[in-house]
Amino acid sequence: MSREPEIMESQVMWEPDSKRNTHMDRFRAAVAGSCGLRLANYNDLYQWSVESFADFWAEFWKYSNIVCSRLYDEVVDTSKSIADVPEWFKGSRLNYAENLLKHKDNDKIALYAAKEGKEEILKVTFEELRQAVALYAAAMRKMGVKIGDRVVGYLPNSIHAVEAMLAAASIGAIWSSTSPDFGINGVLDRFSQIQPKLIFSVEAVVYNGKEHNHLEKLLSVVKGLPDLKKVVVIPYVSSRETIDISKIPNSVFLEDFLATGKGDQAPQLEFEQLPFSHPLFIMYSSGTTGAPKCMVHSAGGTLIQHLKEHILHGNMSSNDIIMYYTTTGWMMWNWLVTALATGASVVLYDGSPLVPSPNVLWDLIDRLGITILGTGAKWLAVLEEKNLKPCETHNLQTLHTILSTGSPLKSQSYEYVYKHIKSSVLLGSISGGTDIISCFMGQNVTIPVYKGEIQARNLGMAVEAWNDEGKPVWGESGELVCTKPIPCQPTHFWNDENGSKYRKAYFSKFPGVWAHGDYCKINPKTGGIVMLGRSDGTLNPNGVRFGSSEIYNIVEAFEEVSDSLCVPQYNKDGEERVILFLKMASNHAFSEDLVKRIRDAIRVALSARHVPSLILETKGIPYTINGKKVEVAVKQIIAGKEVEQRGAFSNPETLDLYQNIPELQNF
């Protein structure tokens, strides 16, 4: 079991305005009226939403005004469990992109794009976005992209990424993306499994004040993807005239690619009408036990779940301007872009959030009138360490919500936000995962914010904390489970014909119940949730989710190292860092030079954010009798717990090497 956190004092940090007529209030009243229920508060609404989950999703479909060409025949077969992966909204026909582009005010800004170190902010109206998507889609069709084909982006958080994704979705192609900070191995581990027909990328990116050439990496990636028919290169940092793409097979500049979609007149926007369960996105697991699993998310499930979170939980409307600091390799990018469906404006920022100054995001908030800011918990902690006080340097008048995810938000960060950023803001810690491309729990405009707690479990998400016996526990740590079907679970994994990988990933711990791989604790008094870190071998420092095997693949190339072990360590706030242990090969010594070379290799092949916090020497690495490296046991030991059952180990004495390591104290 995870270490118990201190008892929460349930200190209120923010309270909702009782006079405010929110979407959540209006939805609760609508449900009470149409279903003949008495729903006095959020808790009543939540309990109904999980007990009568089919009715809940039907009511929300109606409330959210989803655009469809055919209504559903059945919401879901309620006799099926979450492990059966039931089909949702059978018979309906819709298109995800159509729902994001439906906003009628043509001149309203849909996208703002800001880049590190650039004063200029690009703006795209909803009408311009529709025209661009039509052009991208026409060019895709011209080259033979059809329903079910994979279109991928190796792209920064930019307007081009949104346009290409929406065009792919409009056709019924499946979109997948990684960000330019991924190295060659990281990209090929993902994209090679899904055999894309078309890739979009850039020639260079700027991060942390430096320009990083991208073409060599792109060339290596393209060579590893034999099914590619076309490589579209977008001049992003330099002008086209200075870029040489002649070495990249089947490559074309964006301008020339789009020209193929132009006829005598501008192409019309066409939206393929597809089943609710039609694949929209392929997302990736961390790759803990080998190649990353490819999670297929449906168009309808992603849309309705994101709309629920944006409209009901976030009270979002067309008056909002949202910026989430993310890359295209994180699910928060997909989540952010769906906000267009509410008519809100989306701000895309590409670059470091600390360059040219740590105020860069606050400057954007004041300049654009941003109302919702999303970030990683780590960024808030960094600002606090730097003693930044945005409330003294910035207006922040428009800002009503700050969202945080990626890792647990420390209690002291709540204090920092309310004291030094804005006292009236809703600070929403949100938590879910790539596996559901959304949240199990998060912000809520109708209930208080308590220090150190995520506000509530989200509507329709039957979340509990279970002990090892499979019993719900309250006020103590347990495995985060979801007990009822949800439309946002993956429809399947790519290349998992019989579904065995899918079942193993979520349903091997508790039969018929989704086990998410997180430990959490639900406060029985407030209903708030405290996240306590991962319960499996996945590494997730600062929201960058990856597997130990991705690190091992790099370290194996060093002849000085005979073996390695990569594990997370958590502090009392649930913050995570990654520790890499090296077992040296005979006649080789552990050295700072080796540590530097390994760090550099990981940075180049994967990204700077994959580099372990500490690299230490060990004399032995534990294995099971059947030859599996045992990370979980070491993770427990460095957290101060005993490993009682040692019978499965071929070398149990090695476990003692991880007791009381000086470098791991006082984290």
From Swiss-Prot:
GO terms for cellular component: cytosol. It comes from the Eukaryota. It catalyses: acetoacetate + ATP + CoA = acetoacetyl-CoA + AMP + diphosphate. Its EC number is 6.2.1.16. GO terms for molecular function: acetoacetate-CoA ligase activity; ATP binding. It is an enzyme of class 6 (ligase). This is Acetoacetyl-CoA synthetase.
